[in-house]
Amino acid sequence: MNSNDPTAWFTRGTESYLKKEYSAAIADFAEAIRLNPDYAEAYRARAIAYEQENRLADAVADYSAMLLVQPDNPTAYYSRGNCYFSLGRYDAAIADHTVAIEFDPSDSLAHVHRGNAYRAKGDRHRALADYNQAILLDQNDALAYRQRATLYQEIGEVEKASADFRVAERVAQRAFPTEG
């Protein structure tokens, strides 16, 4: 391996990651970044490895560094938003998912995750609006139906919750059929 080649370090880090050797992957991605501080993909890969080790603050830092290199990357906003959510930083999660949605308004998952952050903050109206939008965008999004069902359950709309849980189950069965 050429020790001065950031791509070689990135490749080795990817191989370590695939073997679930996350600490080794993190070290290799760090070396790739040291050799090329603008290596956006290495920041993303290291952030994902940090997530596997539940080092979410480190993952947030790497997604932020990636955004300095690629400010128009909706995936970085989406992923950082998910980390913020897991850290309980709901306003930051909402902000990042909003940016991701601005880049790609048809991203149903970004709507679901922003809805989750709104729900965690107690803003059920905005959460419901996001879940509804996710379902409008992708009627095969079982997660959106489950999240909306859970919200309906929380607000005492039992019939709507039951209906959404049934739809989520049907959608999931179509997506992942079982042998019978």
How should each PLM-predicted stretch be described?
Residues 1-180:
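Alpha-helical tetratricopeptide repeat
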